[in-house]
Amino acid sequence: MTAKPAAAAARATVYGYPRQGPHRELKKAIEGYWKGRVDADALRETAAELRRGTWQQLAEAGVHEVPTGDFSYYDHVLDTSVMVGAVPERHRASVEADALDGYFAMARGTQDVAPLEMTKWFDTNYHYLVPELGPDTVFSADSAKQVAEFREALALGWTPRPVLVGPLTYLLLAKAAPGVAADFEPLTLLDRLLPVYAEILADLRAAGATWVQLDEPALVQDRTPAELNAAARAYRELGGRADRPQLLVASYFGRLGEALAVLAKAPVDGLALDFTESGAGNLDDLAAAGGLPGKRLVAGVVNGRNIWINDYAKSLATLGTLLGLADRVDVSASCSLLHVPLDADAERGIDPETARWLAFAKQKTEEIVVLARGLGSGTDAIASELAANRADLASRTGAALTRDPAVRARTAAVTEADGRRSQPYAERSAAQRAGLGLPLLPTTTIGSFPQTTELRTARAELRAGRIDEAEYEERVKDEIREVLSFQEKAGIDVLVHGEPERNDMVQYFAEQLDGYLATQHGWVQSYGTRYVRPPVLAGDISRPEPMTVRWTTYAQSLTARPVKGMLTGPVTMLAWSFVRDDQPLGDTARQVALALRDEVNDLEANGTSVIQVDEPALRETLPLRAAEHAAYLEWATESFRIATSGVRPDTQIHTHMCYAEFGDIVQAIDDLDADVISLEAARSHMQVARELAAHGYPREAGPGVYDIHSPRIPGAEEAAALLRKGLEAIPAERLWVNPDCGLKTRGWPETRASLENLVAAARQIRAELPTGAA
């Protein structure tokens, strides 16, 4: 049957686009600027060229409105803090002296000034800089960046739509500034902030903007009546002004829920909603609310967070249902395309049959345009695209890669006992203390050490065939010896081999597991200039052979001190990959857990007495709505226990988490039943230690005392001060001393100095303890 065309031709648009450039030009330019090799003018020109390229690509693909203002040197939330004048007092002088250097100082810190805290952007793998606010915060409008980028696109002949982080989301993501009472609520500043937003909107209208997008993803989370009332008040005030452009309020990452009725009644001109699986319920809620009469609806039907092709027939059915629920219906992705790589056509190493299933930002844009044409002109207008899409979907469904009978049989045979250690923690702990013989406040690191130029050169030479595998392995062994030697001299108690053989903590394992695919150019932004290439989990997962045993046992042969085995946990293997969407995540996690269980058991059998299974993604993958937490945490914690419960009681299991607020998952952390957990804590001033104590967490913990996301070197007294805070919450016999995270992105000089200071701090605090331990 042929779909009828929409009353008004649907248009294609996107909320945002990857920033880095086809060859990560932005990363290279910014890092060149930091090193003094690129001047500010050259950096700005590179940025302008990348913006122009993005807008041209979008417009040529058929996108009606191109987003502006979503481009950022580091982070769009940090850009918003600058836009509204919320610069922390400690950074104000540097920003006033040089706006660009001051901006980067807020993100990275300096030797003497700490940066803003960094955490995950909702449940994604992107990180934002947390605004610091207090009762004395004075906002002021600075629309220069937004207006300039709008004018850039306008001058090139495109139709720009500026994108701003909305005022509700900005305040709900903020936290109390240092020195402000921890219970301060940034949302109390809304009436102060709204006039600043109104001024910025007026500036954009004066520059020629007809539509402005205000992103409010915070409204898809559980919100209190007071927060919903604040949303109503905010958009009543902003929407009621005569000097504003038309306002498109965008929600994404889930169901808008109670906030939908609030925004539907507000005097705004359009809403953008997520109609993919993550936004299940938005369609029914919209119909129940009576639709959006007189308003524009932007329907996010293409998944902006995963890399699988769209099901055109399914999306067109959703879009057809939406017709009549709004004055006009346009088509987009479910969120900004920031979260996917740029172009699947650049991938030459993936089997052509499998490549048919992939859609990166460029392909998703093309999908959006096709769907808009089908909605606006009828399905006959896209008949060839529909036929090709059906064939591609069928190819994936029938592929051998996606079904391994042996994996499915083993997964089905898992019992509750497979996820339970043979002894309770109290008994295990005694055996581990006796076996390891560690001092109070034992020191360790999280796993990785700096990835040197020599290491990267060796990998490149191996790939190019200029050295053979044997030569490469000798270079890796040289690096392991150097890392171990340094740790022993520094006085670290539990060592790591430094992971010189690993390119990435997920990709390294994915390349050795059946069922995963690797990309060559699938880069996405994690934070700032840190880009990662998430592997593609396309099929059933199994481990053909041991992955880490030879490197860990080699390292252990060089020292009498314990060397940790280092693995990435099942939840993180999923969260930091692009995961198949054709079966429940819990089923996929169990497959990964069983593969890791084999690796854990092999490490133990080869003499490894401390094994760390990192789960930094446990919190970030937590669903945004509380009603969905229990089901997620059940399979997430079970998968960790399946991976780690096959070892003897005297084998110490560690885990690690970072970048997140942990207060609402402390019970889940407890349920992991790990013997030791290390967590990011330096920037949050040991908040997580207090959260663990409030819960009554009974095991050992290492809240980080060294912020590795900044190049600054914390002094021994600074680390000691954090340890004293930690001891207020965690008893000395259960407190570990460690950095926040791995050291891969740091340089050797700062790493050496920082770890030496960390060990000095541990020794100082041991001496201060009543036992006088040294």
From Swiss-Prot:
Any Pfam family matching the protein: Meth_synt_2
EC number: 2.1.1.14
Biological processes annotated in GO: methionine biosynthetic process; methylation
Top EC category: transferase
One GO MF term: zinc ion binding
SUPFAM superfamilies tied to this protein: UROD/MetE-like
Annotated binding of Zn(2+), by residue: 656, 658, 680, 741
Cofactor details (free text): Binds 1 zinc ion per subunit.
Binding site for L-methionine: 446-448, 499, 614
UniProt: L-homocysteine binding residues: 446-448, 499, 614
Keywords (A to Z) from UniProt: Amino-acid biosynthesis, Metal-binding, Methionine biosynthesis, Methyltransferase, Repeat, Transferase, Zinc
Origin superkingdom: Bacteria
UniProt pathway: Amino-acid biosynthesis; L-methionine biosynthesis via de novo pathway; L-methionine from L-homocysteine (MetE route): step 1/1
CDD domains, alphabetized: CIMS_C_terminal_like, CIMS_N_terminal_like
Family matches, as InterPro entries: Cbl-indep_Met_Synth_N, Cobalamin-indep_Met_synthase, Met_Synth_C/arc, UROD/MetE-like_sf
Active site (record annotation): 709
Reported cofactor(s): Zn(2+)
Keyword Metal-binding included in the entry's annotation: yes
Binding site for 5-methyltetrahydropteroyltri-L-glutamate: 24-27, 120, 576, 620
Catalytic activity: 5-methyltetrahydropteroyltri-L-glutamate + L-homocysteine = tetrahydropteroyltri-L-glutamate + L-methionine
Stated family: Belongs to the vitamin-B12 independent methionine synthase family.
Record's function text: Catalyzes the transfer of a methyl group from 5-methyltetrahydrofolate to homocysteine resulting in methionine formation.
Name under which the protein is recorded: 5-methyltetrahydropteroyltriglutamate--homocysteine methyltransferase
Native species: Streptomyces griseus subsp. griseus (strain JCM 4626 / CBS 651.72 / NBRC 13350 / KCC S-0626 / ISP 5235)
Organism lineage: Bacteria, Bacillati, Actinomycetota, Actinomycetes, Kitasatosporales
